[in-house]
């Protein structure tokens, strides 16, 4: 663990690893992820987090708010990269923690953890500008391919990046998805990372062009069939950091404060003492005086 401990200390300072060391780290994490099921069982206490999007200094604020790993257990519900200034450092920070404390931190796949999306929204360009080639991005994409789809807390609370799918009736259908690879353009896997809840009864077409809008009755039926008490998801900016829907049965958690350095929103994490007993913790963006803003950002970060 000597290498990993050194990496943890280096990356805490918002430094990225040399290319050969990133390769080694990604290979270590891939070996861990290969052992994880599509729905990873997690026990309380645990803290659930939403999108981070490369906002490294705000991720550090999240850890100050919720507690450091390994003293606090975490589930991060995807979208670690793109749009923020420090996607590489942010993802590397989470990977070092996963390598060192694999049972203390769960990393779920978001819709941004794909080759296609990261080529458009900043992560590819950032890796290329920092390493001078695409190798670092390729190593990270191999990790993306293996990130688990969902987590279930105490067999009662389902955590997933986006939402539900008309092709998924039971949790066992999620367990049988072949997740090792790019997320398809349509189908169950795609829906789980792209769908959004909407104030409606059943299913609707998503304006995102991927996934679905899913309503109250759909959610209620899915939860009854699978003996769930709550669904946690991320994927949508919430100005208050957290938003409950469907009679409190579904919650959106957003963990990137002042999203894209301009939205003015607060962020939240959801701390579960037990599956029933939980506490929302709100935090603000780190002041500009306490963060380093790159002199040149070649990729538009708000698209």
Curated annotation (Swiss-Prot):
Protein location: Cytoplasm
Binding site for Mn(2+) 2: 79, 111, 161, 235
Cofactor details (free text): Binds 2 manganese ions per subunit.
Root EC class: hydrolase
Binding site for Mn(2+) 1: 51, 53, 79
One Gene Ontology cellular component annotation held by this UniProt entry: cytoplasm
MF terms (GO), sorted A to Z: metal ion binding; protein serine/threonine phosphatase activity
Family annotation (PANTHER family): SERINE/THREONINE-PROTEIN PHOSPHATASE PP2A-RELATED
Function according to Swiss-Prot or TrEMBL: May be involved in controlling cellularization or in regulating transcription of the genes involved in this process.
Name of the protein in question: Serine/threonine-protein phosphatase 6 catalytic subunit
Taxonomic source organism: Drosophila melanogaster
């Amino acid at each position: 663990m000597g290498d990993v401990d050194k990496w943890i200390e280096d990356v805490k300072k918002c430094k990225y690893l040399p290319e050969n060391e990133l390769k080694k780290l990604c290979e270590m994490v891939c070996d861990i992820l290969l052992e994880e099921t599509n729905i990873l069982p997690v026990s309380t206490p645990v803290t659930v987090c939403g999108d981070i999007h490369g906002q490294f200094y705000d991720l550090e604020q999240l850890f100050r708010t919720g507690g450091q790993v390994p003293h606090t257990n975490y589930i991060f519900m995807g979208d670690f990269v793109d749009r923020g200034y420090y996607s590489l450092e942010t993802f590397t920070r989470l990977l070092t923690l996963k390598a060192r404390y694999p049972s203390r931190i769960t990393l779920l796949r978001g819709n941004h953890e794909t080759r296609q999306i990261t080529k458009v929204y900043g992560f590819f360009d950032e890796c290329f500008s920092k390493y001078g080639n695409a190798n670092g991005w390729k190593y990270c994409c191999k990790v993306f391919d293996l990130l688990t789809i969902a987590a279930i807390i105490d067999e009662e609370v389902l955590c997933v990046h986006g939402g539900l799918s008309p092709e998924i009736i039971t949790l066992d259908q999620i367990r049988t998805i072949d997740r090792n690879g790019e997320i398809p353009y349509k189908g169950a896997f795609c829906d789980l990372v792209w769908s959004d809840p909407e104030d409606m009864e059943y299913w609707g077409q998503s304006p995102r062009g991927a996934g679905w809008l899913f309503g109250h009755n759909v959610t209620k039926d899915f939860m009854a069939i699978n003996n769930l008490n709550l669904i946690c998801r991320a994927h949508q900016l919430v100005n208050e950091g957290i938003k409950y829907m469907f009679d409190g049965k579904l919650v959106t958690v957003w963990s990137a404060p002042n999203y894209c350095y301009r939205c003015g929103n607060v962020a939240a994490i959801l701390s579960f003492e037990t599956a029933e007993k939980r506490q929302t913790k709100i935090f603000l963006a780190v002041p500009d005086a306490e963060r380093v803003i790159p002199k040149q950002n070649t990729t538009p970060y708000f698209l």
